[in-house]
Amino acid sequence: MEGSKTSSSTMQVSFVCQRCSQPLKLDTSFKILDRVTIQELTAPLLATAQVKPGETQEEEANPGEEPFIETRQDGVSRRFIPPARMMSTESANSFTLIGEASDGGTMENLSRRLKVTGDLFDIMSGQTDVDHPLCEECTDTLLDQLDTQLNVTENECQNYKRCLEILEQMHEDDSEQLRMELRELALEEERLIQELEEVEKNRKIVAENLEKVQAEAERLDQEEAQYQREYSEFKRQQLELDDELKSVENQMRYAQMQLDKLKKTNVFNATFHIWHSGQFGTINNFRLGRLPSVPVEWNEINAAWGQTVLLLHALANKMGLKFQRYRLVPYGNHSYLESLTDKSKELPLYCSGGLRFFWDNKFDHAMVAFLDCVQQFKEEVEKGETRFCLPYRMDVEKGKIEDTGGSGGSYSIKTQFNSEEQWTKALKFMLTNLKWGLAWVSSQFYNK
């Protein structure tokens, strides 16, 4: 409900429909309410069913007890609660009417009237399931609904009456037959109850089995997931191992190719490359000798002598040859020969040049001793291969090499009292003899 004040002397009060919330204009009859009208509006609904005289006395004797009816067939107890009755006209729902107020009490009279009207609607709402007030349209709708419910109730009442008439018209035989059918139905009910109990037991057993099966299925799912993870891990390891295997196979093929290539490669020829560069004999691109027009550095000459000593030392070891009188000591560009008769005597196969070079004859003695070792190598080869012959004959006592296939001249391997041209040519012939010895050893010991 809502109210609004339009002036200081008048008040327009409007009520709202409790369904559609539309403002209402009350009928003028609400302004004049006597005691009888209020009692009719606020009186509760009374039971319309007539009560037998005997029952009336019983109810009057026990007004505080509630009627109790028990049906014999279904054993269901039903209780009827009558509606509340108006015990006195001076109950809590009564109103005290106020007479007409004077003009000075208009506002007070209007407030009281408003309170009475509001209380009246509250009482009406409490007596029924419908909230009041209602507008005309909502009232018509409510009446239509009540008419529908009334029709349904009347139809049900007619059906009950027909059933009651049929029951009253039934004979005793029909009743006995019905009782027999009832007993049969009761037996059938007991049988069905037993079957239901059996089914319930089976259901419990099946439920327990289902729970066990579900637990087993869950365990199997977990095992399957674990096996799947392990399978994935093994698959990953397999792929990695396959990659490693392919890599190793590729390495093996490459290593086999290199091995085949190395088997076909002569180690001595690959390690010691003897050739010539103009008038110089070279070993591994180091020139051995020097000319006035081409003053080769002594470091290069010493390195060439170191490679030459290493070559002869390797050939001797391959053949198992032990040199007499001297022992070769490969030591890079400071290689030397060690005298077997005098351990303290070392013959250096390197030189630094200068004035000392012309007066120091150890370098010459070392070259002659090396030529002696080459001669011993030649003699050792000739023991097993009589047809073996070096292109240049060597005279160890004189320290010379003869050009037997050419001019027939002899060239000293010493530097003292010798020209650089002849010394360089003698060294070139010596390298040529070593190349022939290298070729023979390679042919004899290639597969050994």
Swiss-Prot record:
Residues with PTM Phosphoserine: S14, S29, S88, S91, S94
Keyword Aminoacyl-tRNA synthetase: no
Domain comment in the entry: The C-terminal evolutionary conserved domain (ECD) contains poly-Gln-binding domains such as the ATXN3 poly-Gln motif, consistent with structural docking models revealing two highly scored poly-Gln-binding pockets in the ECD. As some binding is observed with BECN1 lacking the ECD, other domains of BECN1 may also interact with ATXN3.
Region (Evolutionary conserved domain (ECD)): 243-448
Function summary: Plays a central role in autophagy. Acts as a core subunit of the PI3K complex that mediates formation of phosphatidylinositol 3-phosphate; different complex forms are believed to play a role in multiple membrane trafficking pathways: PI3KC3-C1 is involved in initiation of autophagosomes and PI3KC3-C2 in maturation of autophagosomes and endocytosis. Involved in regulation of degradative endocytic trafficking and required for the abscission step in cytokinesis, probably in the context of PI3KC3-C2. Essential for the formation of PI3KC3-C2 but not PI3KC3-C1 PI3K complex forms. Beclin-1-C 35 kDa localized to mitochondria can promote apoptosis; it induces the mitochondrial translocation of BAX and the release of proapoptotic factors.
Cross-link Glycyl lysine isopeptide (Lys-Gly) (interchain with G-Cter in ubiquitin), sequence positions: K400, K435
Subcellular location: Cytoplasm; Golgi apparatus, trans-Golgi network membrane; Endosome membrane; Endoplasmic reticulum membrane
A biological-process GO annotation: cellular response to glucose starvation
Residues where Phosphothreonine is found: T117
Short sequence motif named BH3, residue ranges: 106-125
Protein name: Beclin-1
Membrane disposition: Peripheral membrane protein
